[in-house]
């Protein structure tokens, strides 16, 4: 096994490609924050998942939160997203507001949202997927593997506007992702059983293609070539179908962490988001000092991810 304690302090000093003038000319990243949370909807009396909530629920949520709430692949799930936040306190206030509004709207239908990455006893084969063209295509392509995705997560976007810098920091921060996962776990139960894992969500998620830790890339051009290959061969329609633990966002100039469970405690989720933002800030400062975090073998990081 791999000792995180023995590895985490290891750094190697190495020179970046390009001159110091080129590095200095690169704009510093904004490191803005955006947080997305997925909630499962349960019946307040039975505590079971809501199999087929009325369309009026989403209508009311849209009235309350507008574009900050979206439906998900399964009808028993909704997703909220904060606005772009300049600092962590602003993101915290946004999540408090969003959680409160979802609770209030759901309560009017006899439902409640739960911030847990799996439901403790509901069965996946009883759930229905949302009827949208994108979701219908997923259901056809992924079949039963998609229907088992009765799981929720927390995604954290950090603003890194320069393309090559975004890839460079992604390569390095991969090492820390298992640590963030360990801090977030909220999914030990599945269909009425204690699975013996603190994050069974990740085991379910890994059944899909294009998941797990991403490869390293020499720069944005290499990453973009991969995306274009996948799109050109009809495997994916766009980069949003890359479901890695971390990825350059397909919609924003952000680096999106996707590995964590959703935290039942809002304060825990905010602490993890702040830690992720701080790690990227640290790695950028190291770069400015002509240093970088060591790139560890994928096998070792994968073992830490499992542990």
Identify the function of each model-found stretch.
Residues 109-117, 181-184, 188, 284-291:
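Long, hydrophobic, amphipathic alpha-helical segments used as structural scaffolds
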Residues 107-132, 221-224:
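Surface-exposed, low-hydrophobicity interaction/linker segments
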């Amino acid at each position: 096994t791999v000792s995180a304690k023995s590895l985490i302090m290891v750094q190697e000093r190495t020179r970046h490609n390009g001159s110091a003038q080129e590095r200095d000319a690169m704009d510093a990243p904004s490191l803005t924050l955006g947080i997305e949370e997925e909630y499962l909807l349960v019946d307040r009396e039975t505590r079971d998942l809501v199999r087929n909530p009325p369309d009026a629920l989403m209508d009311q949520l849209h009235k309350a939160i507008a574009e900050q709430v979206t439906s998900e692949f399964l009808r028993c799930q909704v997703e909220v997203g904060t606005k772009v936040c300049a600092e962590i306190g602003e993101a915290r206030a946004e999540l408090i507001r969003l959680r409160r509004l979802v609770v209030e709207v759901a309560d009017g239908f006899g439902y409640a949202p739960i911030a847990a990455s799996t439901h403790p006893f509901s069965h996946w084969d009883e759930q229905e997927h949302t009827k949208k063209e994108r979701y219908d295509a997923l259901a056809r392509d992924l079949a039963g593997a998609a229907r088992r995705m009765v799981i929720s997560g927390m995604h954290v976007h950090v603003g890194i506007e320069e393309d090559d810098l975004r890839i460079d920091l992604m390569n390095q921060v991969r090492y820390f992702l298992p640590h963030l996962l360990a801090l977030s776990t909220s999914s030990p139960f599945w269909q009425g059983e204690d699975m013996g894992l603190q994050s069974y969500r990740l085991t379910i998620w890994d059944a899909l293609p294009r998941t797990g830790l991403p490869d390293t890339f020499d720069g944005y051009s290499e990453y973009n070539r991969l995306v274009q290959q996948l799109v050109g061969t009809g495997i994916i329609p766009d980069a949003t179908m890359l479901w890695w633990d971390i990825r350059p966002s397909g919609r924003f100039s952000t680096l999106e962490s996707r590995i964590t469970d959703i935290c039942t405690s809002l304060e825990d989720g905010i602490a993890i988001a702040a830690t992720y933002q701080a790690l990227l800030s640290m790695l950028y400062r190291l770069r400015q000092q002509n240093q970088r975090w060591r790139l560890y073998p994928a096998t070792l990081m994968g073992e830490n991810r499992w542990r």
